Amino acid sequence: MNKLKKKKAGIKDFFKGKHGRNFLLALDVLLAIAFFAQPDLYYNPQAPDFFDRFYADSLIICGGLWAVLVFLTVKKIHFSAEVNRILTYIAGIATPFIAFLWLEFYNDAQFWVPIFSIPFLYLVLDIIVYYVIYVLFLLIFNSIRAASICMVVVTAVFGIFNYELTLFRSMSFIASDIYSFVTAVSVANTYQVQIDVDTAEFFMMALVLVALLLKLDKVKLFKWKGRIVYAIVSCMIFAGFTQVYVYSDYLEDIGVDFRVYRPQYKYRYYGTLLTTMRTFGYLHVTQPEEYSVNAVKKITKQYTENESTETQEKNTSTQNKTTKKPNVIAIMNESFADLK
């Protein structure tokens, strides 16, 4: 444990020192080179006028975010303990909401309709998902700064992954895709990653948010006794959350539904993470009313007995055999389909 602490302290001291800042500054330069190496992000050669060929919004937004990133890289910012604590708690309260707005505006730019067209109840339920995820990160890291950074990174990864997945198969992420991970990996090498202006801005915003959060000093949230209490409370929150969002019919009762094969058409009505959570409910398959395994066995018993008798008769004689078999009527219901 002491070796691990020393290693972490060494890494922290490196990035706080001159060599660490130079290393991060070199990464910023490489990021700018990577941007200009993709002309589609800022240049349209088919425009008739020279100045119209450049995407002003892309150059201004990405350029501005890059300038902020460079400033945060080279500038030493130190807050007093009291100010740092206040800013840390503000970050803890605001990060899930910022992640919600950030992801929804990105999806609005790519596929959906404006966030303000989503009904208020669905917006509230969507925001709750972000805060519950944030509670999980707080439980894991016991640090607001670390939980906020993880929230930003996970939001960025999910947003870009969902966008690329939709481009690849014309279908957004649903919960059953988890069981197709191996298949997805096997065909991933056939897909060409596509980066557009909105994705570049989304990625740059993630870097800026992480850089801002790293300017805060780490504040331990709970001591070990408080952490135990928080773990118990968190488990209660997760239990209630999964019961409402996954195992109950509440979301269905208030009209939250989705199309299995075109879920992105429902994302625009309910928000991204609320729709994603709704798809997890379809992994929980419940038995139809009056369904009984014993009743099925009782009905099929006479036919299985006849089948064994028929097999014996075939060995002795091909005559005088009974071939009584049932008529099977199958009623398919897609809602009872096991997506696993």
Briefly describe each language-model feature range.
Residues 1-7:
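Short, intrinsically disordered terminal tails adjacent to the first/last structured region
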Residues 245-340:
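Soluble catalytic regions of membrane-associated enzymes that act on cell-envelope
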